[in-house]
């Protein structure tokens, strides 16, 4: 909103007011989150890009013979939530490392909660190196399906409050 004020001497002053809240800076302990449900279409699209056509992802009988309840979502597809969460809040972030531990299977239709928590940060050459704890949960956030740690280089610590798709 732009407001005009005219003083007695005829001096015009323009003032700008913004309805945007003040910036939130990332600090150690902050948690960013996103939920997602993976579909059969997601599995197919991922396989086309990765060339991972393992029958566990496409054939329910193969999955059952291997000891699973049904077709599996690719673990790497589920873990792609982590860079998505970070880049949604920090445009221009460079994802430099990720460790992953696959704890439990994810099936098509499971609602997955992805969390990244800042556990360390340091400034270097006008950028920030941030280490994150990364976790995905299912079953109403009770069961850890993936955990690990990620490191990203952020251009600044200003967090976008909503991801671009929201």
From Swiss-Prot:
It is found in: Mitochondrion. It catalyses: a (3R)-hydroxyacyl-[ACP] = a (2E)-enoyl-[ACP] + H2O; (3R)-hydroxyhexadecanoyl-[ACP] = (2E)-hexadecenoyl-[ACP] + H2O; (3R)-hydroxydecanoyl-[ACP] = (2E)-decenoyl-[ACP] + H2O. Disruption phenotype: Thicker leaves due to enlarged mesophyll cells when grown in ambient air and associated with altered thylakoid membrane assembly and starch granule ultrastructure. Dwarf plants characterized by reduced lipoylation of lipoylated proteins and altered metabolomes due to reduced catalytic activity of lipoylated enzymes; these phenotypes are partly reversed when grown in 1 percent CO(2) atmosphere. Depleted 3-hydroxytetradecanoic acid levels. Its main location: mitochondrion. Gene3D superfamilies: Hotdog Thioesterase. Its EC number is 4.2.1.59. The keyword Transit peptide applies. 3-hydroxyl-[acyl-carrier-protein] (3-hydroxyl-ACP) dehydratase required for mitochondrial fatty acid synthesis (mtFAS). MtFAS are essential for photorespiration and plant development, probably by influencing mitochondrial membrane lipid composition and other lipid metabolic pathways. This is 3-hydroxyacyl-[acyl-carrier-protein] dehydratase, mitochondrial. It comes from Arabidopsis thaliana. The lineage of its organism: Eukaryota, Viridiplantae, Streptophyta, Embryophyta, Tracheophyta. The gene is MTHD.
């Amino acid at each position: 909103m732009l407001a005009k004020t005219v003083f007695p001497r005829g001096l015009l002053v323009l003032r700008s007011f913004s309805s945007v809240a003040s910036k939130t800076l990332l600090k150690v302990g902050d948690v960013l989150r996103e939920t997602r449900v993976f579909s059969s279409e997601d599995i197919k699209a991922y396989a086309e890009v990765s060339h991972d056509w393992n029958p566990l992802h496409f054939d329910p009988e193969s999955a059952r013979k291997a000891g699973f309840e049904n077709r599996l979502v690719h673990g790497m597809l589920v873990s792609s939530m982590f860079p998505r969460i970070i880049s949604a809040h920090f445009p221009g972030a460079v994802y430099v490392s990720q460790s992953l531990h696959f704890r439990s299977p994810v099936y098509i239709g499971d609602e997955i909660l992805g969390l990244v928590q800042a556990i360390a940060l340091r400034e270097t050459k006008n950028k920030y190196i941030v280490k994150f704890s990364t976790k995905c949960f299912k079953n109403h956030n009770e069961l850890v399906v993936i955990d690990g740690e990620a490191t990203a280089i952020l251009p600044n610590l200003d967090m976008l409050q909503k991801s671009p798709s929201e």
